[in-house]
C-alpha cells in the first residue's frame, strides 16, 4: 500500500473516531487507532493531528469532556482555499457584508484591501467573522456584491 493511501486511511479513521465523541484523552485516541491496525501511531502524532484538523475538547451528551471536530465552524486546514472560509455574502444599498468562519475575516479583508479601488472597493472593515465592504463612488453596491461573489465562487 502506498504511503499516501496509508495516510488517507489514518485520517479517515481519526476523523471517524472523533465523531464518536467518547475519547477524553490523546492516549485513548492512540489506543483506538492501534486497535484499527495503525501500529506506528503515538501520542505526539495524535496531538499534531488534533491541531491540524482543529479538534477541540467539549462536553458530549453525557457531559464528559471529549475531543471532537467542530465541522459546523468551518475550521480551515493548511490546504483550504480562502473561498471555503466564506460562509455568506450579502448586501444592502450601502455595504457588502461577508460572514466568514471564526477568525477568518482579517485574512479575507486583507485580500480585499489589496484589490482596492481598481476593483471598486473604497474600504474594508473586519471583525472576527464579519467584513463590511464599501464601494467607490463609481461602483454600485450591486456591482461590488457580484464581483465579491465571483471572487469567492459564492452563489446565492
Curated annotation (Swiss-Prot):
Known function: Regulates arginine biosynthesis genes.
Any one annotated GO CC term: cytoplasm
InterPro entries (UniProt xref): Arg_repress, Arg_repress_C, Arg_repress_C_sf, Arg_repress_DNA-bd, WH-like_DNA-bd_sf, WH_DNA-bd_sf
One of the GO biological process terms: protein complex oligomerization
Pathway connected to this protein: Amino-acid biosynthesis; L-arginine biosynthesis [regulation]
Predominant localisation class: cytoplasm
Similarity field: Belongs to the ArgR family.
Keyword Transcription regulation part of the UniProt annotation: yes
Keywords, sorted A to Z: Amino-acid biosynthesis, Arginine biosynthesis, Cytoplasm, DNA-binding, Repressor, Transcription, Transcription regulation
Protein name (Swiss-Prot/TrEMBL): Arginine repressor
UniProt keyword annotation of Nucleotide-binding present: no
Cellular compartment(s): Cytoplasm
Molecular function as annotated in GO: arginine binding; DNA binding; DNA-binding transcription factor activity
Amino acid at each position: 500500500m502506498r504511503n499516501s493511501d496509508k495516510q488517507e486511511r489514518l485520517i479517515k479513521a481519526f476523523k471517524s473516531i472523533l465523531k464518536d465523541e467518547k475519547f477524553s484523552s490523546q492516549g485513548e485516541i492512540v489506543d483506538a487507532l492501534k486497535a484499527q491496525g495503525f501500529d506506528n501511531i503515538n501520542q505526539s502524532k495524535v496531538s499534531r493531528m488534533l491541531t491540524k484538523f482543529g479538534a477541540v475538547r467539549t462536553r458530549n451528551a453525557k457531559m464528559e469532556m471529549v475531543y471532537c471536530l467542530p465541522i459546523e465552524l468551518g475550521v480551515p486546514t493548511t490546504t483550504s482555499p480562502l473561498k471555503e472560509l466564506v460562509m455568506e455574502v450579502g448586501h444592502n444599498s450601502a455595504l457588502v457584508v461577508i460572514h466568514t468562519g471564526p477568525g477568518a475575516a482579517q485574512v479575507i479583508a486583507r485580500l480585499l484591501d489589496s484589490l482596492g479601488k481598481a476593483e471598486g472597493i473604497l474600504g474594508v472593515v473586519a471583525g472576527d467573522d464579519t467584513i463590511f465592504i464599501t464601494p467607490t463612488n463609481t461602483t454600485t453596491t450591486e456591482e461590488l456584491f457580484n464581483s465579491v461573489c465571483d471572487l469567492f465562487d459564492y452563489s446565492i
